[in-house]
Regions:
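Structured, mid-chain assembly/scaffold modules that mediate subunit interfaces
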Residues: 42-201
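Generic N-terminal initiation segments characterized by hydrophobic and/or small/turn-forming residues
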Residues: 9, 22, 130-132, 138, ...
Length: 219
């Protein structure tokens, strides 16, 4: 009987050892190494940089432009002006260091290199609008956390999940301004977090670098 050539163990497939696991088991022990190698290519490889820049340029281009389309031209004009004001770094970024377009460009890059990024919604006092964004790298998820805040839930990879595998909270490591890790992580409810990553399998719980399939070739 002839089955699938892809499943044969002949000369062409010799040495190709594979097995099936859940996405989380497959990713868990490789995620950090893949991310570190992707970042090394980002820093040191001209080919890697050309890929990253082309991706960012094609995905984001010159940035977002809001086009309000209410029935009132006056309201449309006011909303457009307010949007432009909010996009300034002092209004949209909790650190006041990046404009909204710069934030989005960085997010596109971190998505490709790191596999994802977390946006935390921060509600502030005062300002143009009492709302700003905080960007958190996926490294800052506390993978040592194991005790859920809610009975019946499970903590995996620094994220608390309910029985339906829905994220309900994030354990975030804390660092001082010089980058030294502090002892106690902060728990942030999922309703305040916007995770940006690509889910490729139903059993996948966290991100993996988009560069994973090409890292060995680029190197």
């Amino acid at each position: 009987l002839r089955g699938y050539d892809a499943a044969s163990h002949g000369r062409l497939n010799s040495g190709w050892r594979v097995f099936n696991e859940s996405a989380e088991l497959t990713d868990r022990y490789s995620r950090d190494v893949i991310r570190a190698r992707a970042r090394d290519l980002e820093r040191n490889s001209d080919i890697g940089q050309s890929v990253i820049r082309a991706f960012r340029r094609n995905v984001f281009g010159k940035g977002y432009k809001l086009q309000p389309k209410t029935e009132s031209e006056l309201l449309n004009d006011q909303l457009g002006k307010l949007w432009k004001q909010w996009c300034r770094k002092e209004n949209c970024d909790i650190t006041a260091s990046q404009s909204f377009n710069q934030i989005m460009r960085m997010a596109a890059t971190r998505k490709q290199v790191d596999g994802g990024i977390l946006f935390v919604k921060r509600y502030t006092r005062g300002g143009l609008v009492p709302f700003k964004l905080q960007m958190i790298e996926v490294d800052e998820l506390d993978t040592t956390a194991s005790i859920p805040r809610h009975k019946g839930n499970t903590v995996v990879g620094g994220i608390e999940y309910d029985p339906a595998r829905r994220a309900v909270g994030y354990f975030i490591q804390q660092y001082d301004v010089e980058g030294w890790k502090l002892t106690t992580p902060v728990y942030i409810e999922a309703k305040y977090v916007i995770p940006y990553w690509t889910k490729r399998r139903p059993s996948q719980l966290r991100e993996v670098s988009d560069l994973a399939p090409t890292i060995t070739r680029v190197r």
